[in-house]
Amino acid sequence: MYTIIACIGKNNELGLNNKLIWHIKEDLEFFKLVTYNHYVLMGRNTLLSLPKKLEGRKYLVISKTLETTEDYRVFKSIDELLRTDFASENIYVIGGAKIYEEMMPYTDRMILTIVDDSHVADKYFPIINNEEFISDVIGEYHSDDLTYKRKIYTRKKED
């Protein structure tokens, strides 16, 4: 099962200069809690942008240039990943924008933190087709002068 997890702005802003725009302590703690002891899927740029290793997570990386190491398993494409046994695992898709977009058709669920703010960005979260997903707000929060809500999107079952 693939679950996208991200923090975005009200206009789908995701990142600027290969960095996250918002660093909300409570949201980062939520991210750790949800993804701990699971696989996390990311692109090469997201891997290289991490300030430190995400303890307790197993990395899957999509990259045409990196090679598998003891720290992460590399796939040359999403198609290559989808043909493996990992498809039966709970995998959290953690970015970046291109990986979110490419994984959207295969995603069962999305957990999005949506900040009620806009910001200059050079990377955006893909547009969600509301005919494919049911959404539920699971919480509304305030932190450091920011208001944000957490929404879960679940793919609608085909008739």
State the predicted function of each range.
Residues M1-D159:
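Enzymes that bind and transform nitrogen-containing heteroaromatic metabolites
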